[in-house]
């Protein structure tokens, strides 16, 4: 076997490893599989010891949020996905706070306490469910890049 055959095999192997690593990183970081839609008596609470002390408070806020009236709004993204948000009106023609949830989160889980704070300031609220979360379409989170 010539030296250039070995070099080609090494280069092809490295290329394969590069693409395999890229795919694995994408899958672990950006891909979001089947989304769970929670029933009326179920609550989305993050896992981990750091959240245990706040569990009752998070459930309380999510219950309160579910009792508020809101208007469901949606837009269609450039790549033809339906993206949803909920508009909560506190005071007509007043300040609007637009809230976005965190990584692999949802508006209900991450922002239910924010509604209470915003309403205390007489602010209206738009809670956005970014792509691949809650009701919004998609399976890949883009950290808001494609929602601009």
Model-derived features: positions:
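Conserved alpha/beta-hydrolase
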Residues: 118-137
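Histidine-centered divalent metal-coordination motifs
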Residues: 84, 101-102, 133
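Short beta-strand element of the alpha/beta-hydrolase
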Residues: 94-102
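An N-terminal hydrophobic leader/cap segment in hydrolases
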Residues: 14-75
């Amino acid at each position: 076997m010539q030296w250039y055959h070995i070099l080609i095999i090494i280069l092809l192997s490295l290329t394969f490893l590069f693409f395999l690593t890229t795919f694995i990183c994408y899958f672990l970081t950006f891909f979001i599989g089947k989304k769970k839609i929670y029933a009326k008596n179920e609550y989305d609470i993050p896992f981990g010891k750091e959240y245990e002390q706040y569990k009752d408070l998070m459930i309380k806020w999510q219950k309160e949020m579910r009792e508020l009236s809101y208007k469901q709004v949606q837009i269609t993204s450039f790549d033809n996905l339906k993206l949803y948000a909920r508009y909560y009106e506190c005071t007509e023609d007043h300040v609007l706070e637009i809230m976005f949830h965190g990584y692999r989160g949802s508006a209900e889980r991450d922002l239910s306490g924010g509604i209470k704070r915003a309403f205390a300031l007489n602010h209206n609220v738009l809670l956005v469910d970014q792509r691949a979360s809650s009701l919004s379409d998609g399976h890949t989170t883009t950290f808001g890049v494609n929602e601009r």
